[in-house]
Swiss-Prot record:
Transfers the gamma-phosphate of ATP to the 4'-position of a tetraacyldisaccharide 1-phosphate intermediate (termed DS-1-P) to form tetraacyldisaccharide 1,4'-bis-phosphate (lipid IVA). Belongs to the LpxK family. Pathway: Glycolipid biosynthesis; lipid IV(A) biosynthesis; lipid IV(A) from (3R)-3-hydroxytetradecanoyl-[acyl-carrier-protein] and UDP-N-acetyl-alpha-D-glucosamine: step 6/6. This is Tetraacyldisaccharide 4'-kinase. HAMAP family: LpxK (MF_00409). It comes from the Bacteria. It comes from Bradyrhizobium sp. (strain BTAi1 / ATCC BAA-1182). The gene is lpxK. GO terms for biological process: lipid A biosynthetic process; lipopolysaccharide core region biosynthetic process. It catalyses: a lipid A disaccharide + ATP = a lipid IVA + ADP + H(+). Its EC number is 2.7.1.130. Keywords: ATP-binding, Kinase, Lipid A biosynthesis, Lipid biosynthesis, Lipid metabolism, Nucleotide-binding, Transferase.
Length: 345
């Protein structure tokens, strides 16, 4: 889905027209968030956001999985598998699954950390535990009450913030902000910008910690692409962030094409991009998530076109403070779970 432009305008007439629906949607969402969830029997860390669309959750999940391994944990990611046909529960295997089976984000993450896809998250807990999970990392699902969360981390894009601050469909918020803030344990601001700082100020005023992070491109890929004209395309929550990252890396982006999030690329679309790249003497470049979705696409089996993925990793500005918060919450969770007192060795 493409975000409507009026979501980022403060007094758009469309938002005013949709306000009654937002009141109803917000009331239902807030009531749902207040419900109790299943205790998974192992600590659950949720990485979510306040709003619809991309904010950097996937690289945050991967960065947190690395941090948890440093703490001696064995994290398993639990995802709804948006865009995949399998309801699950299923353990994602990149050797046999495609994005059409399990979704593009789980497929991409499974190259780095064990991932379980389950349309109903509570049903995926058992499989995650059989995969050796000492901690479950929920990819999204902050507003979903099905599981009790021991640590809720909210991710926002510093450049975008919360748009017009209104609840869907008048704006991008998934629920009214006050009940979401009440259930937030910490905020992670990815990148910089006044919009993100405004959200950070509200979270700080609520007595919650704020962590800063940035996306770090792979230096070897940047070096390989330097000096080459690039035709960039992306079907993610915020394609413009990807294009900005390319340019901020000093790369020569001669053209760009934005698609909706989780867009199922057609052979004709890829062929058209390849033709345009040839005419411009450009290299096709996209995100890791988009390349995961293109995996197995028959046109990619040919020698032409060659599509380069542009990998990024999330770097925390103060990993020590975040590590301390995570370790404290894990210890607290295990105090109420006597059957899971010790972390794996």
């Amino acid at each position: 889905m493409r975000e409507p432009a009026f979501w980022h305008r403060p007094h758009a007439w469309q938002s005013l027209l949709l306000s009654p629906l937002s009141v109803l949607y917000g009331a239902i969402a807030a009531h749902r968030m207040a419900q109790s969830g299943l205790d998974a029997g192992v600590p659950v860390i949720c990485v979510g956001n306040f709003h619809v669309g991309g904010a950097g959750k996937t690289p945050t999940v991967l960065a947190l999985s690395a941090l948890l391994r440093e703490l001696g944990e064995h994290p398993v990611v639990l995802s709804r598998g948006y865009g995949g046909r399998l309801a699950g529960p299923v353990a994602v295997d990149p050797a046999i699954h495609a994005a059409a089976d399990v979704g593009d984000e789980p497929l991409m993450m499974a190259a780095h950390v064990p991932v379980v896809v389950s349309r109903h998250r509570a049903e995926g807990v058992g499989l995650a535990k059989t995969q050796g999970a000492s901690v479950i990392l929920m990819d999204d699902g902050f507003q979903n009450p099905s599981l009790t969360k021991d640590l809720a981390l909210i991710v926002i894009d510093g450049a975008r913030g919360l748009g017009n601050g209104r609840v869907f469909p008048a704006g991008p918020l998934r629920a009214p902000l006050p009940p979401q803030l009440a259930r937030t344990d910490a905020l992670i601001v990815v990148g910089s910008g006044a919009a993100g700082e405004a959200v950070a100020a509200r979270v700080t005023a609520a007595g919650k910690p704020v962590f800063r992070a940035h996306l770090q491109p792979d230096p070897e890929v940047v070096a390989a692409l330097a000096g080459r004209p690039l035709l960039a395309f992306a079907g993610i929550g915020d394609p413009q962030r990807f294009f900005r990252t390319l340019r901020a890396s000093g790369l020569d982006v001669v053209g760009e094409r934005a698609f909706p999030d989780h867009h199922p690329f057609s052979t004709d679309e890829i062929a058209a991009l390849a033709d345009k790249a040839r005419h411009q003497g450009a290299t096709l470049v996209t995100t890791q998530k988009d390349l995961a979705r293109l995996r197995g696409h028959r046109i990619l089996g040919r020698s032409d076109p060659v599509i380069t993925a542009f990998p990024v990793t999330l770097q925390f500005s103060d990993p020590t403070a975040l590590r301390s918060l995570v370790a404290h919450r894990l210890a607290s969770a295990r105090q109420r779970q006597p059957f899971a007192l010790s972390a794996p060795g």
